[in-house]
């Protein structure tokens, strides 16, 4: 029996179909959790979803060899609106066609531009191209508040609009960066345990990077969109031990739980997404 998303509780799980060509990377379906409903600052009458698990190991942004800032030259750019990851998440382009430069020194996440040559994704199709198009058609454009670092980007904050996006420290219940609230707390994130995320089997098996602690049974790092105020090249992420934030250089690998999206609350789960009853 079909249900509306709005009738389900925060924490309920939804399966979204992956197109057959991409199932080796993500499995046949990606599982999302309801993170909130009618969340402040998000589209009205919407339901917010986030992936249940860490679905890929990817860099936030690639090294920028022509950037005049030495940190960004070596490690990548932490300005969220310019990140490779955000662009890929919101693209429905075919394989190898999702990337375009967002500023004069921008660079794609090629093998040469990612940490230790692990897990480049410049040749992939855009993320939206990998999902059921009927589901993608229902995604709502959402405005996000993003802090800016004080070193290169002027401090304060800016807004970014997209359909898929990364959460902020504020939204997962961690400290505001430089006293800037990047949105408001999502209802799903009530304590440390609620921030724990585990890699999927496909995330582990598809990764060129290996580690004895990188497994489906152990929690791992996942990206946030928040840049530390005093750095040009690192980004906050939820870490494994204390489930608080740490920082990682943008070309380094962290795990992409990443996906937050909004759908109207009347969206029927039977249309393309299916509720998981557990």
Regions found by a protein language model. Give the residues of each.
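Collagenous Gly-X-Y triple-helix signature in extracellular proteins
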Residues: 1-278
